[in-house]
A protein has these predicted regions:
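Extracellular/periplasmic Venus flytrap/periplasmic-binding protein
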Residues: 81, 125-127, 134-238, 274-287
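Extracellular/periplasmic periplasmic-binding protein-like sensory domains
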Residues: 231-305, 367-370
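Extracytoplasmic "Venus flytrap"
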Residues: 27-48, 70-77, 99-102, 165-173, ...
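Sec/Tat signal peptide C-region and signal peptidase I cleavage site
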Residues: 17-22
């Protein structure tokens, strides 16, 4: 009897020990094999820099953080299915760095249904900013803010014949609102606005518009390989229009895919210059990258993941031991001017935007972003 009792006690002790030091599971669904895979992998690598650093120092109250990533191939239906599995079967505490506007929209109903926070979604969709969703915590500026700045910049440098090319999904229809607002602010109108199908991009109509209208610049609202192929189609018409696209394409993979069409392309950015040692955020990321790989070079996409991981970790720290989904959400609400390295992140019951930093970069002849 005593032997059985002791055996049971030992099992319970091991179980308690395992519970006390169980991994904190964080879920991610994103495109790891489709048209935006290169940027997704860079963003995840940036997040891993900070998560690995935290785990090496004991994790959160002795509990390591594990990022559970699933490939949705950039399909909204897959993103929703992955998110449901992460929430219901993997029992993640939060979702993190989910990529894509329609993909995040597909996930939104699950957040309130299961009471799960979504931290640092890798999209600037306004629907995640306004109205405030109590379960969504953004760590980057909106696409509308980026598109607005891009058009105002083009106007400032004297370009008025500006065309717009946009994908025909919720990302395109969201981002174009920022461009339209900017045209109103500078008393201008777009030379043309053309759309293309996200599933089966065909740029024939866009080539015709470029040929007939001869734009000085084109704001291209799309993602990854579609933008690469669209720019190739535009250049095939003989057009030398200035190409501008948004931060969702701010990755090394995008530059490489553009090939000979990369140089001179303007890409909006939502984090500081990745080669600037004046930015504490960049400096820290570069130091950790060098320690991990021997090379201190980081990319804008990596900085997005790095910044998001800093906010995630701080939320977990404030949530206390064995953080729950609700504790984490409540903890994130307490972030006020939280310094992640020269940038301050703030959340409140009336604002979950976190940051509104935007900048412009241009791809140089060396195949790197410059500012």
């Amino acid at each position: 009897m005593n032997r059985n009792w002791l055996r049971s006690l030992t099992i319970l002790a091991w179980a308690a020990c395992g519970l006390a030091h169980a991994d904190i599971l964080i879920g991610q669904t994103a495109d790891f094999s489709g048209p935006v895979a290169s940027g997704v992998k860079e963003t995840a690598a940036g997040a891993k820099l900070w998560i690995d650093r935290v785990n090496a120092n004991g994790g959160i109250n002795g509990e390591p953080i594990t990022l559970v990533s699933m490939d949705d191939k950039f399909e909204p239906a897959n993103a929703a299915a992955n998110a449901r599995e992460l929430i219901t079967r993997k029992k993640v505490v939060a979702l993190f760095l989910t990529r894509g506007t329609p993909h995040n929209q597909a996930i939104l109903p699950l957040l309130s249904e299961y009471g799960v926070p979504l931290i640092a979604p890798s999209t600037g969709a306004m629907v995640l900013h306004k109205p405030v969703n109590p379960w969504v915590f953004n760590v980057r500026a909106s696409y509308q803010h980026e598109a607005n700045r891009a058009i105002r910049h083009l106007s400032l440098v004297g370009l008025s014949h500006i065309g717009i090319v946009q994908v025909n999904d919720s990302f395109g229809s969201d981002a174009v609102k920022g461009a339209q607002e900017a045209f109103t602010q500078v008393n201008g109108t777009p030379l043309f606005t053309e759309t293309y199908d996200r599933e089966k991009p065909d740029f024939t109509k866009i080539q015709a518009a470029v040929t007939s209208q001869n734009p000085q610049a084109i704001l291209f609202l799309g993602s990854g390989s579609a933008v690469v192929n669209g720019v190739r189609a535009i250049r095939a018409t003989g057009s030398h229009a200035q190409i501008v696209t948004l931060s969702n394409n701010a990755s090394d993979g995008f530059i490489k895919a553009l090939g000979d069409n990369a140089t001179g392309t303007i890409v909006t950015q939502v984090f500081p210059y990745e080669r600037s040692l004046a930015s504490p955020l960049v400096k820290e990321a570069r130091q950790l990258q060098k320690a991990a790989t021997g090379d201190d070079r980081v990319t804008p996409a990596m900085l997005e993941g790095f910044a998001g991981a800093k906010v995630l970790v701080e939320g977990l720290r404030r949530a206390g031991k064995q953080p729950t989904r609700e504790k984490l959400r409540d903890a994130l609400e307490t972030l006020r001017r939280y310094d992640i390295g020269g940038l301050e992140v703030s959340f409140s019951p009336t604002s979950h935007s976190g940051l509104d930093y935007t900048d412009l970069s241009i791809i140089g002849s060396d195949g790197k972003f410059t500012r």
